[in-house]
């Protein structure tokens, strides 16, 4: 699933491509991907709207239109591509926004897990999925004090806590593993067992890793590309995720993989305590 760095890069490329484009037709080929509103109403609400800009909150994309906002989640493999209307439509294209300039913004999703819904313009706080999100890790709202308070309140594994979007928005499986490694903390450690120094290291690792991942275009581990079709580069920086049995870059011991709350989890048994 694309995490914050990947979604931020999708947002940035979309922001270069679609503002100012006016929707004159919407085609929904997979109705279940439209949530909270019947698909025909979704289409009716969007025709005639102009895209003013693209924002992000956590792993959500928000397309601000003339009178409303489209809230979209890529889920596992969703992608947006801007294409000429004459280009062949692939079988994995499930939603099409056709513009007056004869281009189309197409939403492709091999697994059909992605979702879209229409909300009040700038009213994302009124939607349950957005309202519950915690602070963005690269903003001033993400403070060491609040983070430490949240961590100390739970006995869940620290990796599980990092994946809780109410604690910090946008961290997923890849970056949670990398954060724990950088902080030298075992991912299965109970969050409330961590010392203040360990919590501080996790906080700092979250900021530094997410900053670099955004700068490098995210991680292309499976099929991720941004909206211009470009691969990410941070996968070349990964130290534990996907490195099972490979030598640790610090100590040389083999990286181990376990299941933690149903998620594949990678760590160095020597460096992380």
From Swiss-Prot:
Annotated positions binding DNA: 92, 111
Q: Which UniProt keywords apply?
A: DNA damage, DNA repair, DNA-binding, Glycosidase, Hydrolase, Lyase, Metal-binding, Multifunctional enzyme, Zinc, Zinc-finger
Which chemical reaction does it catalyze?
Hydrolysis of DNA containing ring-opened 7-methylguanine residues, releasing 2,6-diamino-4-hydroxy-5-(N-methyl)formamidopyrimidine; 2'-deoxyribonucleotide-(2'-deoxyribose 5'-phosphate)-2'-deoxyribonucleotide-DNA = a 3'-end 2'-deoxyribonucleotide-(2,3-dehydro-2,3-deoxyribose 5'-phosphate)-DNA + a 5'-end 5'-phospho-2'-deoxyribonucleoside-DNA + H(+)
Q: Which InterPro entries match?
A: DNA_glyclase/AP_lyase_DNA-bd, DNA_glyclase_Znf_dom_DNA_BS, Formamido-pyr_DNA_Glyclase, FPG_cat, MutM-like_N-ter, Ribosomal_uS13-like_H2TH, Znf_DNA_glyclase/AP_lyase, Znf_FPG/IleRS
- Required co-factor? Zn(2+)
Taken from the record, one Pfam family name reads Fapy_DNA_glyco
**Renumbered zinc finger spans (FPG-type):** 239-273
Under SUPFAM superfamilies, the record lists:
Glucocorticoid receptor-like (DNA-binding domain), N-terminal domain of MutM-like DNA repair proteins, S13-like H2TH domain
| Residues annotated as the enzyme's active site | 2-3, 59, 263
The cofactor remark states: Binds 1 zinc ion per subunit.
Per the record, the GO terms for biological process are:
base-excision repair
Q: Does the keyword Magnesium apply?
A: no
| Any one GO molecular-function label of the UniProt entry | class I DNA-(apurinic or apyrimidinic site) endonuclease activity
Enzyme Commission number(s) of this protein: 3.2.2.23, 4.2.99.18
Quaternary data: Monomer.
Q: Which family does it belong to?
A: Belongs to the FPG family.
Classification via PANTHER family: FORMAMIDOPYRIMIDINE-DNA GLYCOSYLASE (PTHR22993:SF9)
User: What role is this protein assigned?
Assistant: Involved in base excision repair of DNA damaged by oxidation or by mutagenic agents. Acts as a DNA glycosylase that recognizes and removes damaged bases. Has a preference for oxidized purines, such as 7,8-dihydro-8-oxoguanine (8-oxoG). Has AP (apurinic/apyrimidinic) lyase activity and introduces nicks in the DNA strand. Cleaves the DNA backbone by beta-delta elimination to generate a single-strand break at the site of the removed base with both 3'- and 5'-phosphates.
The protein here is known as Formamidopyrimidine-DNA glycosylase
User: Which organism does this record belong to?
Assistant: Listeria monocytogenes serotype 4b (strain F2365)
